[in-house]
Each structure stands twice: as structure tokens, then as C-alpha cells.
Amino acid sequence: MPRLTPLPRDAFDFAAARHLLVRAGFGGTPGMVQGLLSRGLDGAVDWLVDFEGESASGPDRNIQADTFDPRVKMQLTAADYESYRKAREAGDEEAIAAFRRKQEQQERDDRGAMRSFEQWWLSRMIETPRPLEEKLTLFWHGHFAASYTTVENSWHMFRQNQFFRKHAAGNFGDLLHGIIEDPAMLRFLDNNRNRKGSPNENLAREIMELFSLGEPELLGRKRSPYREPDIKEGARALTGYTYRDNAFFFDEGQHDNGLKRILGRSGRWNGHDFVDMLLGHRSCSEFIAWKIYRAFVNDVPETPPSDEVRNVVVQLGKVLKGNKYNLKKTLGELFRSAHFYAASNRAAHIKSPVELVVGSVRDLGVPVRNIDTLRTAAARLGQRLCHPPSVKGWDGGRAWINTSTMFLRQNTAVWMLTGRDAGGHPWPKDTTPFDPMPLVEQLERQGEVDPDEATVYLQRLLLACPVEEARSQAIRQVFTLANDRVNADSLTAALCVLTALPEYQLC
């Protein structure tokens, strides 16, 4: 079985434990990092990847019964359309207006349900005792990207989210097979219009290009592993894959059962045969390894990547393929590897907006204050949950940062720390008290905290890399202005300075 070179066990220190908790989750308080460190490398990795052992508490309780109703956005029935047609033929303006009012109210209700779902998911990421489960759910949402803007059905988006969560660290094959039966994806890529004799190529194209085999230039390949005829034949294999009444439906009458030639193999292939062929191609495991690498190890702005990175990705792909696409085993191998903890891979990932707001709550221990404000902040920063900009998902990396988003990131952190709006945004003032002193409680000596120690410790705790001396002194200056006292007010002010640093945007 292929292996990545493991990290020496004695090299798993506080900084390594923090790196693991941030990358495989959304970070945490000093106590959480110390708890992970106390488990040792193997125990820490096992705890993260074997998350089923932790109870799913928090906002997950009764979510289906209390928050979402599949009837909010039911598809209009044939009877509804027939009634509408008759009303139009008869010129019954009252019936037509009633039909439209019902439709508009249904759409408003569904948009409200979608907002509730976004709030729920953000809350779950903040509160979850299973950080890797939610990190992977977010990862698969970006990989198999579908947007509510097109789907226009909150229940379908919710069910897709639950599907990603169910298989988060399971088997990639189950994810790929399941996505061709997912109503949200079928609607998003128009496969509900993919019929015998009139194939729609959208799903077939994206399942090859974005979901399984990838584009050739990503890993420096000389040629694509598939060609246009493969896409066309794959589309035929997916004919009849649609949905009815909020569930997948295989319309046998609209399925093309003729002979098809895909990736050099001929047969009367259906959609799942098509998926099996993709999973069997060597490019698939490498491409998924590449996506995992970019999400969990290093953003890698250069394309194609360096020889070193490519070698690690190829090896990780072999681990994935050797484990028959078992994600838990593959991630465990990655999180134990020396490469994952290498200095070149620390502070090598720009926090996404969701990672920023969720991670700040978990790292700093600030109150949530207003979950919809956090949702709105992430959206303004470029990442609204369930609204990726395209089927490619979010570009990530350096695309997250520009002059305006950097300013908004800084102001978001100030609001989270103080409840006050520093940037002129219509965010609600929040007076929920925040006591930052637990962050430095282990530095306390005879009831006081040394400001020099606090300055160094905060950087060690919250930053993934050292900062210039001038920036460190800017943090220290806050305590100087407070007569060298480290208390709730001065510590909060110091955190406002620290979270405004460019280095805070990295993990």
C-alpha cells in the first residue's frame, strides 16, 4: 500500500496541533488545541477523522422537523398547470391572479427557508463537536457546486447538504454515484431535460471535467483523459435521470438504452456504469487528491504545480486509489504526513470568508452575537453558502483578497470582538459581553499577566507565521497605552489590532 512519509511523533507540538485543528476543522481555543496535543499525533488524527464517535449536538437537533418543510417549494403538478391553462383560456383573471399570488408566496417562503438553512449551517460549523465533518461538508459543497439561484428549492439544497455530510469522510465513489441522483444537481445542470433523442450534455461534461477527471493543465498533463465524444456518450448514459416530488426518479422511457462508447469501452451503459468508468480511470484519484491537497495542505497558486507538490499529489492519489476511494483512510494518511506539517505549508492557505468568521468565533471564543450578520458578512466577502458563483465553485486562494475585502475582513473582526460596527455597514450593535481573559489565563501570575508575554503568546496562538517586528510592536503598544495592564479592555483592543494583520488571514 502506498504511504506518505509520516511526521515523527515527537514533532507533534502545540503549533502542529493548532495547524491540524485549523486545517482539518475551523480552529479552536487554547484549551481545544491543548486537548488535541494531549492525544498525540495518532490519537489526534483518529479523533478528527473518526468523528462518528462524537455526538452530533448543537443546532442539528430536530432540524428536519422544526426548520424545514419539503412542502414549502413543491413542484407544480399537472393539475395545477391544467387549472392555470383553463383559467387563461377562459380569461378568468381572478383565478389567474390567485394562482400567481400562491406561486409568489411560495417563492417568498422558500427564500426565507433558504436563509434559515444558511444560518443553521453556519451555526453548526461554529458549534459542532465534529469539526472535520463540517469542513468536509463545506469542501464537497465547493467541489460539487450547485447554487440556490438556479435550483430555487431550499429543500433540495438542504437534502444535498445532508448527503454531503453523510458521506463526508466515507467513499468518494458513493459521492460520485449519489450526485447523479441528487435533485439539486440534476436541476442545476439541467439533467431533468436530458432525454432520449435530445441529450443535454451539462451534467456529463461537468462530472468529467470538474467532479472526477479534471482539466489536463491542473497537474501538468499533456493531454486530456477524455474527449468530446466521451462527453456526448456520457450524456446519453445519463438520459432519464431526473426527479419527481422532491426525490430522484429514473424515467426509463426517456433513457437511451442504445450502444455507447465511453473512454474506449462499448456497451449499453447507464449513468452508474458511466460513473464506474470514471472511478476506474487513473486520472480520477489523482484529480481528487489534487483537490484535497489544495483545500487542506496548500492553495498552490502555480499551475502546473512544482515537481515536489506533484509528487506528493500523485502519491496521495495512489493512497486514495489503493484504499478504494476511502476518504477517511486517505485523510488520516495525509494528516499524519510530514509534508502536511512542513514549514512551506504553514500560513499557506488564505482563509475563505466562512473559515474566517467561523474560525474567529472558535479561536477567540467571542459570542456569536447575530448569526445572520455573520452570514451576511461572509456573503459580502465573497462566499454565500449555497450560492457558489458557478459550477466550478469558488476560486479560493488569492481570489479571496483585494483592497475592499481586506478592509471588510478587518471590520468584521472588530464587530465580532466588540459588537460595534467599525466600517459603516448596517450591522446591529450588540452588547453581549466578551471576556477575552481566558485566552491568556495560563500566563497569569499573582493575578496579573505580563504584557510582553501576552504579546508573544497571542501571536503564537492566533497566527500561523511570525510577523514583522513593527507589527508585533503595534500589538504591544496597545498594552503600553493601558499602563502595561492586560485586562479585558486592553486585550480586546490588542485582538482588534492582531486580527487586522494580513497574517491573520492565513492559516
Spell out what each predicted region is:
Residues 15-23, 109-111, 199-202, 206, ...:
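Short, compositionally biased low-complexity segments
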Residues 10, 111, 129, 224, ...:
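Aromatic-acidic/polar surface patches that form glycan- and anion
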Residues 2-13, 18-30, 51, 71, ...:
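Flexible, low-complexity segments enriched for small/polar residues
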Residues 2-3, 85-91, 95-103, 114-121, ...:
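Active-site substrate-binding loop specific to GH73 endo-beta-N-acetylglucosaminidase modules
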Residues 28-143, 147-167:
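N-terminal accessory alpha/beta regions
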Residues 36-37, 48-49, 88, 126, ...:
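Hydrophobic residues in alpha-helical segments
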